[in-house]
């Protein structure tokens, strides 16, 4: 991927972050710094020439973790996240990754429903993990998609 293309993609991801997570958005520079690590990669979905969705993930040996995933608000509920998961699952399984982890706010019911639809299961709950000023703390759910079990069941 050429540098100009990558920079514009990262800028678009940072812009989407600001739209969908204004209090917790990761900046362009944070994304650039993370992507300098060999274990971290970025998938993007385009519509025409526009970045409409992204997934930032990290691989560590036989396990991967989604660090950030998002879809531009104008393109939500159009299957963008499912396309991201399909591509990510294909890449990770080709690399013999056994499981994929993610963390989600327990009050983010649309995201949880999507993750469950993709085959993720809740494996842990962090009580009061997300703290927001003037609001009660929200739990974090750790969810896992186990490729090894999927392969065993389908094989």
Where are these regions (language model features)?
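Acetyl-CoA-dependent GNAT
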Residues: 3-74, 82-87, 91, 95, ...
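Conserved catalytic-core motifs of GNAT/GCN5-like acyltransferases
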Residues: 103, 116, 121-139
